[in-house]
Design a protein with these regions (language model features):
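PRPP-associated nucleotide enzymes
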Residues: 1-229
Length: 229
């Protein structure tokens, strides 16, 4: 796949194809970062540890930022999975704005650099419950920073134990929430491409009991159906 690296509006369809073409899905029993068990996950490491694809993802995020009209001082990747992406985005942002600051969030407490009195957009890879984002917000407040928004590369579109969506969790903390892709829609694409056998598709559907029956196995779904968006 030829990657479009020029600035402009976010190309949603291209981003979905990028995820599928780079084989980022991992199928099989796993424990997610949230602690939940699942029969699949999205593994962003291959895309974020190669400079060409890292640059593409960073520019995709900035295209979305441009569409949304956001003007933060800092982009910070939620540690540790998207730390490199946060840095890549900040470097591109500096080229556009002239801002010369860089802050990296440590895994537990503290930062490399000083985020105080700066507006922050947090970047996350795949969100499930939003727990890591809430912890980052609490840390930012302790350091007198101003978190304003969260952008996830992919949203699993599942509910927390309290029955809330990640959007509701983030917005309850006073931040805007945006995602570049919906995992159920990606799974529809993966199933259409023959990447998911039918027995596994049934298990995946069972993980999404809150969605309409047959959302994955149904034969009439268009590839990018925006099922839950």
């Amino acid at each position: 796949m030829k990657l479009s690296l020029s600035p402009g509006s976010f190309n949603e369809l291209e981003f979905y194809r990028f995820i599928l073409d780079n084989d980022l899905f991992r199928f099989g029993e796993t424990v997610l970062a949230s602690g939940r068990k699942s029969c699949f996950k999205l593994d962003w490491e291959p895309a974020l540890t190669k400079l060409r694809t890292l640059d593409y993802v960073a520019r995709s995020v900035l295209a979305k930022v441009n569409d949304l009209g956001l003007e933060p001082d800092l982009f910070i990747g939620v540690p540790e999975g998207v730390t490199s992406l946060g840095v890549a985005i900040q470097l591109l942002w500096a080229e556009k704005t002239g801002l010369d600051n860089l802050v990296i969030s440590r895994k537990n407490e503290g930062y490399v650099g000083n985020p105080a009195h700066q507006q922050i957009v947090y970047i996350e890879d795949t969100v499930t419950t939003g727990g890591s984002i809430v912890r980052e917000l609490e840390k930012a407040v302790k350091h007198q920073a101003w978190p304003t928004a969260v952008i996830s590369l992919a949203d699993r579109k599942q509910l927390t134990d309290s029955g809330k969506t990640v959007r509701e969790v983030v917005e309850s903390q006073g931040m805007a929430y945006h995602n570049l892709s919906s995992v159920p829609s990606l799974l529809v694409g993966a199933y259409a491409k023959g990447l998911i056998p039918e027995d596994l598709a049934k298990k995946i559907e069972a993980e999404y009991a809150h969605l309409q029956e047959g959302w994955l196995l149904g034969k009439e779904k268009p590839l990018w159906s925006g099922i839950v968006d």
